[in-house]
Regions:
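Beta->alpha turn/N-cap motifs
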Residues: 82-83, 91-94, 98-104, 210-211, ...
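Short, well-ordered beta-strand elements
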Residues: 28-33, 198-211, 231-237, 306
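Ligand-binding clefts/hinges and TM-proximal coupling segments of bilobed small-molecule sensing domains
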Residues: 43, 57-64, 70, 145-191, ...
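Short helix-initiation/N-cap motifs at beta->coil->alpha
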Residues: 60-88, 235-246
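Ligand-binding "clamshell"
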Residues: 27, 92, 106-120, 266-278, ...
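A bilobed periplasmic-binding-protein/Venus flytrap-type ligand-binding module shared by bacterial periplasmic
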Residues: 127-146, 285-299
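A conserved helix-loop-strand patch within extracytoplasmic ligand-binding domains
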Residues: 27-51, 153-158, 278-306
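Short, polar/charged alpha-helical segment
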Residues: 46-54, 59, 65-67, 208-237, ...
Length: 306
């Protein structure tokens, strides 16, 4: 082959390599789904930061927004969508951050399926602890106090751990070393417990996520009945996370059991609600799940570093 021909071949190879490199650089970023509601959006961003996909402005603290992402370490794009659609759309994303409220009904178990689990302290102040909320004027209501006391018992703690398989954790003191009375063999007896509201004081509690995510309130009802408290818990289900606070503010329900401390502060500030925490309930850690990849490293490899 003459020198001119060799030069042509070399130029062609160089051009092909350049085109390949350009194509790689121009490849569409892998999509990472996060909840689009305020508090969980922040949690999702923080979890993706912990996974090493992005860097976030430290000044944003626990509540970063998309604009606070300062660097994408890999060729990824963070995409907020409705939290309740994240499980059903998991296949459309490289990975998504999903909390237990929506993961449980979809059959996702953190210890089995999650690529990364949000780390949360089970004691002390935590902005993502779920709480029971009352109108501030009712914070000393004795009936409501009894409901919280019944929830924060060993039976309910055991039920949370056994029934939800590490998706929910108690956010109140309990004896971790005790021989649990609640087991896989009898947990269904508690979730299937039936009570009557005849002759009892009815307390309406707002929840989201369907019955399967709120069976701990059935365990709480059993505790109340065993104590002869004459209190009946009526769960009022809402389709959207922002509705229970409005309902309790309007007097349509008595308590709200579906929100974190961080969201409560934000929602009260935005809407002028006079609500307060009367008890901690559970911790539902956010997790990274994927149908396409079996590890965080596999996602990073597919995305490519930037």
């Amino acid at each position: 082959m003459n020198r001119i021909a060799k030069n042509i071949v070399t130029l062609a190879a160089t051009a092909a390599l350049a085109l390949t490199s350009a194509a790689a650089l121009a490849a569409a970023p892998l999509q990472l789904g996060v909840p689009d509601d305020g508090t969980n959006l922040s949690r999702g961003i923080k979890l993706l930061e912990a996974a090493g996909f992005i860097e976030v402005d430290p000044a944003a603290g626990y509540t970063p927004e998309i604009k606070d992402i300062t660097k994408h370490l890999y060729n990824v794009e963070v995409t907020p969508i409705a939290a309740n659609t994240l499980p059903s759309t998991l296949g459309d994303f490289a990975a998504s951050t999903i909390n237990g409220t929506y993961a449980v009904p979809y059959g996702l178990i953190p210890s089995r399926d999650a690529l990364l689990i949000e780390k949360q302290d089970e004691n002390g102040e935590n902005p993502y602890v779920n709480v029971v909320v009352a109108r501030t004027a009712d914070k000393d209501n004795e009936v409501y106090k009894k409901v919280v006391e019944a929830y924060q018992t060993q039976l309910v703690a055991e039920f949370l751990l056994v029934n939800y398989h590490e998706t929910f954790f108690p956010a109140f003191p309990y004896d971790e070393g005790a021989t649990f009375a609640v087991t896989e063999d009898n947990v269904s007896e508690i979730s299937g417990y039936k009570s009557s509201k005849e002759g009892k004081t009815v307390v309406k509690i707002g929840v989201c996520g369907g019955v399967s995510n709120n069976e701990q309130w059935i365990a709480t009802q059993k505790v109340l009945d065993d104590e002869g408290a004459n209190i009946y818990i009526e769960l009022v289900e809402f389709d959207a996370y922002n509705l229970p606070n409005e309902a309790i503010n309007n007097g349509d329900i008595d308590l709200n059991a579906f929100q974190h401390k961080a969201y409560l502060a934000k929602d009260c500030g935005a809407n002028g609600y006079d609500l307060t925490v009367i008890g901690d309930t559970l911790i539902a850690p956010l997790c990274i799940y994927s149908e396409k990849y079996d590890s965080i490293d596999a996602i990073k490899e597919a995305a490519g570093a930037k």
